[in-house]
Amino acid sequence: MQELKRTPLYNIHLAAGAKMVEFGGWLMPVQYEGIIAEHQAVRSAAGLFDVSHMGEIQISGPTAREFVQRLVTNDISRLKPGCAIYSPMCNPQGGTVDDLLVYQLEDQQYLLVVNASNTDKDFHWIVSQQVPGVEIQNVSEVTCQLALQGPQAEKILQRLTAVDLSHIKSFCFVYGAVEGIHCLISRTGYTGEAGFELYFPASHAERVWQAIMATGATDGLRPVGLGARDTLRFEACLALYGHELTDDISPLMAGLGWTVKFNKPEFVGKEPLLKQKEAGTTYQLVGLEMIDRGIPRQGYAIFKEGQEVGWITSGTFAPTLGKNMGLGYVEIPFADVGKELNIMVRNKPLKARIVKKPFYKREV
């Protein structure tokens, strides 16, 4: 059996009393004081996440722009150094290899931030597409990534850097020192809240983590594990690979059509996606609120009048709403907001209602 990987903050998590679990080949903190308390801290104050298990793949060289443009479905020609874009990366059949962030570091240099469980798969896929004039490096092991999220995030981080954080727009980044350590400071996140993601050498992980935690102590900052990271992204209806997106699920089916730019001359998966767009998808990703008591879990079947019409991709108790909610794929004729369906929970058909997504949106 392959030994589980550890982030540079493994000992910090143990000292903080974290409950550690296996996730995508890593030993990661699922919670510290508790998922609901950590979730509420991010919504009301701030939370600090160790996301060093995420993958970082650097692409550079004279043809890097054209290469990345063909690799992903979104249009990176609009990017300039200091900006980032969210995009799916598709296979030739139009299914999703992964969803990722593309950072433009320099004129012909990009950083692709991919999902932890997909890092090796993605790296090998990208290398298999390699063309002359492109260098591809997996820099995941030498990179620490932290996410500071929540309404107090900017106030907390500002105490540790001379960079004016208020000038960083959404999906943009700057380079600057945090606690004296050179970082890429990005206004991005995966929680539905305002916040930042920091990238810097893994050797400085403990120093930066401890400085942020100490600085934010009086503002309600809490360390946050993967459990609350999932409930936060779930309330914001942000896709999680392996759930809402897979090798067999296209970005169009997942409601991510806005990230697929058909006006680009070429990208992997373009032809099947174009056919799918013209014909329409069979299923639609919907939000579900439980009427009966129960939590819908991934893989549970969805029925309408005894006919199976879909399946659940994610489901949990949503702490901000105080309700049991789900995300799932439902056949188009049954996917209208307000429609009632049945979800098979432990062999019992429980009532649920289709509701608008996202379940939570931060008030600006």
Swiss-Prot record:
Belongs to the GcvT family. Keywords: Aminotransferase, Transferase. PANTHER family: AMINOMETHYLTRANSFERASE, AMINOMETHYLTRANSFERASE, MITOCHONDRIAL. One of its GO terms (biological process) is glycine decarboxylation via glycine cleavage system. The glycine cleavage system is composed of four proteins: P, T, L and H. Its EC number is 2.1.2.10. It comes from Desulforamulus reducens (strain ATCC BAA-1160 / DSM 100696 / MI-1) (Desulfotomaculum reducens). It comes from the Bacteria. One of its GO terms (molecular function) is transaminase activity. The glycine cleavage system catalyzes the degradation of glycine. GO terms for cellular component: cytosol; glycine cleavage complex. This is Aminomethyltransferase. It catalyses: N(6)-[(R)-S(8)-aminomethyldihydrolipoyl]-L-lysyl-[protein] + (6S)-5,6,7,8-tetrahydrofolate = N(6)-[(R)-dihydrolipoyl]-L-lysyl-[protein] + (6R)-5,10-methylene-5,6,7,8-tetrahydrofolate + NH4(+).
